[in-house]
Amino acid sequence: MSKPYVVGIDIGGTNTVFGIVDARGSILATGSIKTQKYTEITDYVNALHEELSRLLAQENVTDQIAGIGIGAPNGNYFNGTIEFAPNLPWKGVIPLAQMVREKFNIPVTITNDANAAAIGEMTYGVARGVKDFIMITLGTGVGSGIVINGQMVYGHDGFAGELGHVIVRRGNGRLCGCGRTGCLEAYTSATGVARTAREFLELRNDESTLRQLPIQEITSKDVYDAAVSGDKLSQEIFEYTGTILGEAFADFIAFSSPKMIVLFGGLAKSGELIMRPIREAMEKNLLAIYKGKVKLVLSELKESDAAVLGASALGWEAS
């Protein structure tokens, strides 16, 4: 009988979360360690091995794991590496899949976190059975995973699909964390929304409840709360953000003709505040042959579970 469980590991800049998952996408148990606590990769892998082994033993499934999937910033599917991830404590190229495989003697697959989210959506979520879609994660950054004909698009080197870093404002665009200017992420991530709020408040005289807050401490949640309460400036910030996203989505559709675009992450939970301007700008800018054909949908995976589920879906692939 094939082994009934896989392990999903989601590596974030602050925490690493892992879980034991069955083929239906039910999470048996989860655990975590502090990513930032370990400045040496060997110490990190040792801690991960210790905590995950404890969880497997606790659930009495140590010998029932088919594979391990890892989602990580700048994870390279082809090489099994994390490469030059700016928000992780280990620099350069880290052969993480090999290191974890040697600890557990179980097949290991790694990819970037947005690709893992797309695979999770395709395996357990709203994109199940959909062969062509784009996953967009709207959080601190903007990530993406592209699926064409049922296959993740990795490109020749494993780094295809960095749609958060397409240029949407040329010339005098905002500086992005990647070092370039004008990237989609600089405008439409949670930090981008907060930055738009600061710019609007500094450049305009509109009344806004946001003016009651220290300007440098304003967050995207502050903007959302104000918008829901009827603050016109905050609503305009969402309009601005959604329009940029919708225009970008129209371009994305032109090169892959997806059946749907799936949105996930904190900003996506803003509902129609963000969905309406995205939808309107996307349809307005679509080539005629694509109009009315592409669904814009929200992920159905629980945010607390999605990262582990996405990574776990890779575990079945590894097995």
Placement of each model-derived feature along the sequence:
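ATP-binding/phosphotransfer module of carbohydrate and carboxylate kinases, centering on a glycine-rich
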Residues: 1-67, 77-79, 98-108, 123-130, ...
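Hydrophobic "anchor" residues
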Residues: 27, 82, 152-153
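Short hydrophobic alpha-helix segments
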Residues: 31-33, 86, 156
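A cytosolic small-molecule/anion-sensing beta-strand core signal
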Residues: 72, 78, 148-149
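A charged helix-plus-loop insertion that forms the helical arch/lid used to bind
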Residues: 81-92
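Short loop/edge segments at beta-strand edges and connector loops
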Residues: 110-114
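Acidic/histidine-rich catalytic cores of soluble enzymes
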Residues: 118
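Glycine-rich phosphate-binding loop of actin/hexokinase-like ATP-binding domains
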Residues: 128-187
